[in-house]
Amino acid sequence: MTAITGVILAGGQSRRMGGEDKGLLQLHGQPLYQHVLQRLHPQVDQLLISANRNLSQYQLSGVEVISDSLPDFPGPLAGMLSALQAMKTEWAAFCACDTPFIPRDYVVRLCQQKGNAHAVWVRSVQRDHPALALLHRDLAGPLEDYLLRGERRLLHFLLQEGGHAVMFPDDESAFSNINTPEELTSLGAR
């Protein structure tokens, strides 16, 4: 199998969390991004964290931290673009920092089902999860053009580039992301 960079997307503004940096919120005594890191690290060859604030706290993990090359937090696509431009491998597996329960075979399953596509993402029983995606570095140019046109719709971009979903009929909670303080409290009680 080809080398893959795992990328934790932690660069958002977290408006529904009152502006707190979601990746640094605590779940079971450790930051959310650390839960993702522990699940993603064994599945990839290299790691990056895409963050736009609290960089020194993310750097404590020992993982290379990159920031968006485009200003003003233009969404997860900006973090994906920065990672595609910075990575040294052909492929990147992306995870949002607030998805602490991704499957331990997430990357291999995406790789097995990608075929000739340059983009694949998770589809659970309930919905698509386009921020949980495997992208080829050749998408950096088209993605930059897309963002410079003012576009921000992640799933639209992936479809436009010929990508397809990969079905993950796992427990839906494997793809739960944490958007509110109430959701974090609920997960902490498990």
Task: Annotate each language-model stretch with its function.
Residues 1-151, 156-175, 182:
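Nucleotide and nucleotide-moiety/phosphate-recognizing core
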